[in-house]
């Protein structure tokens, strides 16, 4: 046995000892089942105010609860690291959240044990992300051969990694992309339902997996916020804003590209323009970009106040896949933005395409300068946001989610 395995074993022993001391007992009767029961497994307890995938999954959970579906949530965390500030938040919503406990014999009830115990009563297992489906689908199906297996792609990982390879020419990325393609296609074969997050991902998947009737589209949920008296006009706004978690490589690349290539061109025209970068899990290489005009604000719990004083949102994403929550979030608040084709994927910008979308460094800089200084174009872009978001309404998504559960 390796030293790492021994350390993990010892930490698990200490956890079990602590649970015994505190009398944290597992009782199946503490969990609420109903006529329809859904098991959701993700890498983490969704951090809905930190990343787009977590926000989307949280909204799906809320829709399930609204429709009287019992939800059981499991995170693929190590037993001795099974901690999250978000566990209680989901419990407060009415979600059955797995947490380590001990059985009547004093044995640790692991997440795998929990899955085996509840799955005979589960109707649908919603496995979120490729590695989660690959890891847990067999365990779930063995515990209940009749369970409906849902593979939620979140985004087409193969496409995201391949695009990154095409940008950086790193052979390791190409190998990683090919690895994920095998995982994702195997998952598609084993799933009863495959969820793509955008029409683009769905069409790209067709090139590799032709069982189209299995694949459904469930995108992000974005509700446009109607302008009120508190909505700040063009004249009362300043600065650029980028939002994104730095656990996600496309965000790190976009911020470096913005600072090192795009903004020097913008600053020639608008020397005092400030850029605010909001996002959790900031790394050392991102910290090194900070300056008086390029502010790293870290994690901000409530973005509303920042968004309502910002003049322009920027997202110069050079690779990625799926729907970008940051784009929808900007549109929700009628905040004009400048992004790339990758950033805009899944959204129909219509007549605003030529105003808000650019794919070269010079064009990105030009569009930022134009929208930051041109009130007429800014107002038109702001007023177009509601129409762009229409396909992402809660009513549309609710119908799609309920179809997956009941059909």
Can you say where each PLM-predicted feature lies in the sequence?
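Non-catalytic membrane-proximal stalk/linker segments that position and tether the catalytic domains
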Residues: 1-47, 53, 86, 93
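Conserved catalytic-core segment of nucleotide-activated headgroup transferases in glycan assembly
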Residues: 53-58, 189, 193, 207-211, ...
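Membrane-proximal helix-turn-helix segments that form the acceptor-binding/catalytic region
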Residues: 157, 172-194
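C-terminal alpha-helical cap of glycosyltransferases
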Residues: 394-407
């Amino acid at each position: 046995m390796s030293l790492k395995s021994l350390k993990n074993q010892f930490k698990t022993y200490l956890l079990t000892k602590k649970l015994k001391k505190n009398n944290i007992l597992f009782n199946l009767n503490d969990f609420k089942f109903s006529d329809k029961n859904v098991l959701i497994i993700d890498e983490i307890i969704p951090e809905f105010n930190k990343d787009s995938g977590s926000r989307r999954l949280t909204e799906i959970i809320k829709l399930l609860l609204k429709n009287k579906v019992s939800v059981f949530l499991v995170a693929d965390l190590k037993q001795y690291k099974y901690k999250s500030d978000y566990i209680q938040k989901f419990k407060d919503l009415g979600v059955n959240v797995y947490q380590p406990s001990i059985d009547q014999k004093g044995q640790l009830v692991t997440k795998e044990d929990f899955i085996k115990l509840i799955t005979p009563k589960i109707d649908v297992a919603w496995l979120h992300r490729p590695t989660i489906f690959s890891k847990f689908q067999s365990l779930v199906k063995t515990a209940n051969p009749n369970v409906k297996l849902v593979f939620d792609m979140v985004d087409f990982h193969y496409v995201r990694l391949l695009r990154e390879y095409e940008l950086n020419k790193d052979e390791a990325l190409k190998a990683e992309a090919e690895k994920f393609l095998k995982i994702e296609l195997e998952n598609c074969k084993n799933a009863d339902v495959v969820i793509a997050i955008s029409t683009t991902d769905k069409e790209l998947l067709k090139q590799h997996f032709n069982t189209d009737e299995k694949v459904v589209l469930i995108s992000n949920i974005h509700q446009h916020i109607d302008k009120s008296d508190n909505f700040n006009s063009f004249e009362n706004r300043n600065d650029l804003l980028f939002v994104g978690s730095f656990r996600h490589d496309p965000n790190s690349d976009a911020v470096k590209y913005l600072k090192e290539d795009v903004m020097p061109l913008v600053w020639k025209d608008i020397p005092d323009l400030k850029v605010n970068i909001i996002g959790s899990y900031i790394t050392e290489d991102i910290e090194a970009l900070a300056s008086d005009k390029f502010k790293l604000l870290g994690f901000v719990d409530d973005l509303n106040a920042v968004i309502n004083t910002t003049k322009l949102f920027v997202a110069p994403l050079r690779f990625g896949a799926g729907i970008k929550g940051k784009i929808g979030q900007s549109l929700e608040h009628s905040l004009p933005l400048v992004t790339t084709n990758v950033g805009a994927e899944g959204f129909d910008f219509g007549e605003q395409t030529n105003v808000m979308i650019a794919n070269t460094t010079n064009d990105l800089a030009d569009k930022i300068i134009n929208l930051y200084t041109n009130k007429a174009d800014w107002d038109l872009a702001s007023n177009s946001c509601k129409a762009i978001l229409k396909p992402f309404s809660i009513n549309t998504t609710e119908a799609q989610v309920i179809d997956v559960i009941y059909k």
